Amino acid sequence: MKLFMGKIFDIFFKGSKPALWDDIAENWLLILCVVVAFAAIITVCVVLIKKKRGEPHISEKAKPLFDVRSLSFAAMCLAVAFVLSFIKVVDLPQGGGITPVSMLPVILFAYIYGPKRGFIVSFAYFLLQLLQGVYFLNVVQFFFDYIFAFTIIGIAGFFKKNLLLGTISAHLLRYLSHVIAAYAFFREFNQTGINDTAYCLIYNSFVLIEMVACIVIILIPPVKNSIEKMKRNLRKSVR
């Protein structure tokens, strides 16, 4: 316990990346299996409880925020997003990098199920991001670089009729969050000769590159049609 608490102290007060997190990063596939298995167990438990109760009808007010279908879809979206976030097409030296549209699965969930569920799943995505390693400088930096940056993805849920605007909003707000953290706490790493504001804007443009990739994908006609069809089918359980 003392060793564990020491590692937690290192993470949250010294800003270091202890060996514990290196081990987690190296065993991401095992972690993914555990996450999916845990989500599957929860799903099975919910199904069994519903069958045991044998409730023929649940009133609108009594409906849980997550039913079996939405919970299963959330687990799938988180699993896919988690795997994609490990694949760095470009890995930047001071943190961050270009991934193959790792935010898109979470954006899709928020788009289909709305902001309440969207923000909850986005927050879960933030928690999963911590498994990849945390650079903690102070509470404000941690908030903008991690908590807000990933939880804000759920804002796509406010654009139930416009996936494009939801995608753009989620990426731009995450981009802005990283830029604020970079300018406030990391501009000292700027050794490029350009001004600090431009440096922070350019460095964090990896989020904008992913945004463009997401836009291209969701505007492909077959993909767009499949998403809308999936939305109609999944939303049946919410009505």
Where are these regions (language model features)?
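Loop-helix junctions at membrane interfaces
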Residues: 1-239
